[in-house]
Amino acid sequence: MIKKIISVFLLLACIITSAFTAFFYHSKLSDQTKSISSLSSQQAQERLQSYQDSLDFYKKLNISLSVAIANSLRDKAVEELNAIALRIQENHGFIGVTFASLDGTMFTDIGTLDWNAKTLRRDWFVKTVELGTKHYTAFDIDKTTGQHVLTIATPVYVGNDIVGSVALDIAGDQIASPNGSGMFMMTDRNFNVFASDLTHSTLIGKDLTKEKPLFKNLVSGQYVTFSDADSHWFAVSQTEIDGENKLFTIIDIQQIVQTYKRDIQLIIAGFSGFSCVMLIGLYWVLSKELSGVRQIREWILSLSDGQIKERRPIKFHNELDTIAQSLENLQFRLLDVVRNSHRTMNDLSIKQTDITYSIEGNTNNSQQELGLIEQVATATTQLSCTSFDVMQQAQSAELNAETAQKLIAESHDIIDSSSKQTEMVTLSIHESQQIINQLREFSDNISSVTDVINNISDQTNLLALNAAIEAARAGEQGRGFAVVADEVRSLAVKTQQSTIDIQGIILKLQEQSQLADQVMTRNVSLIHETQVANRALIASFNLISDKVLEISNINSIVSTAANEQKIVTEDVAKQMEDIRYLVQENLSAMERTKQANQNISDLTTNLNDALSFFKIELTS
């Protein structure tokens, strides 16, 4: 327990120390940030002020030069202007000094140039001479020297008239002097360094983003810390100059970082020492106050082992006294419970034996009842099945009788229909016989006509023969007539032959008509006999239908009686099944009661065994 309390205390101490350290860390970090920002801003302002002062100085110098050389420039005193330019260049170390006249002639420290500023439309010339404004360019790399150069140009006045322009080419390190406190670098818009302190002078003319990639993503007004190869810490910040150039200010923050680390270490050491002192004090207090825990633990262990002993009251003079008193009360109550439980278990064991005997007797009686009920239920079920079979047979017979009645009715209808059709056939045969008789009469008439045609063809043949004879007598004049007569005779012969064929056909038609008349007469006789048989068959079907109807009525009565008997037997069987189910439920309940009683007996035995765990020891 003491170990757990100490562990919790150590955990809390670590958490508090960590929280305070984090708070102090952020507080110191904020102070450090403010300090670095202040130093960086101060150094940047000083460097910007120096830059601006230099720029103002050269602007004023340019104005002074414009006043000094006004008359010489107006008169184009070439040698004098070149000498002045050379002297100024040597005195101030400018990259170049140029005086330009109105026509664009350029007088420099190296002599008069052979190219014209006006013709080339130099930006500084146009703005100063033509527009009359002061001008200075951004830093650009001079093609001759490779240095970054700032050009300052001012118009030259004589009275109110512009007579020319003065231009000074100033190196970047002239405007931003490397002397002074602090480290810095100035770059153009492309991050090319044109001025720096002496420490970083090797970077002049180089791309700063390639030499110092960290500087590329700097935001104006913020700083970034970094360390060199010797783990020396610095902070760098960026400031815009003239909207295009950039000033990178570098300050040494090694002392600030060391102070910050030392303060953090002191805080951690102080809290660690304080925690150790508190831990020692806590251990001493806990050891003194919890000395009685061991005795209480032994007491509880003896109770857990079933040893119930009388003990003298224990006093610890702290909260443990309450626990000791509670244990003493628990021991007294536990003693009463164990004694009462032993007595109750003995009584319960006796009662359980009596209950077991009663349950076994009831179970035997219920099993006998169940056997008798099952026999009655079986007989009832068989009776129900027999009634059901009788009902089914009666219903089947009734259905068959109904089917027979339907078939008889349908046969009766068929016979009636057949009789009607027979009568219609008889009538049709009579009509056909009349038509055949008429056909025979027509054949006789046609035969007389063919006789007439035959006589005509004989006479025509005879006439044609006579005509041929007369044509032969006529000679050449009767030849055409002889041909016609011959054709007529030929047609008469064909007509006579056709008439003979028609007479043969008519004779056959008359013979067939006579045979058809005889057959139809015989069919009429047969149909009459069929009608007589149909009438007798209808009478037989009527008698059969009456008998089948009587059988159907008897089957209906038998089916109804069998159905009622089936319903009664099914109701009896259902009631017997319910009785059997109740008896089975009683048997199951008795079996469960028996099992529960056995379980109670087992539990009683187990409880006695469990209570035997407690060993009561009383002191005299």
Curated annotation (Swiss-Prot):
Keyword Cell membrane found: yes
GO BP annotation list: chemotaxis; signal transduction
Origin organism lineage: Bacteria, Pseudomonadati, Pseudomonadota, Gammaproteobacteria, Vibrionales
Species: Vibrio cholerae serotype O1 (strain ATCC 39541 / Classical Ogawa 395 / O395)
Ranges where the Methyl-accepting transducer domain occurs: 344-580
Membrane-related topology note: Peripheral membrane protein
Similarity comment: family membership: Belongs to the methyl-accepting chemotaxis (MCP) protein family.
Gene: tcpI
Name of the molecule in the record: Toxin coregulated pilus biosynthesis protein I
Keywords: Cell inner membrane, Cell membrane, Membrane, Methylation, Transducer
A GO cellular component annotation in the UniProt record: plasma membrane
Function recorded in the entry: May function as an environmental regulator of TCP biogenesis. Negatively regulates the synthesis of the major pilin subunit of TCP (TcpA).
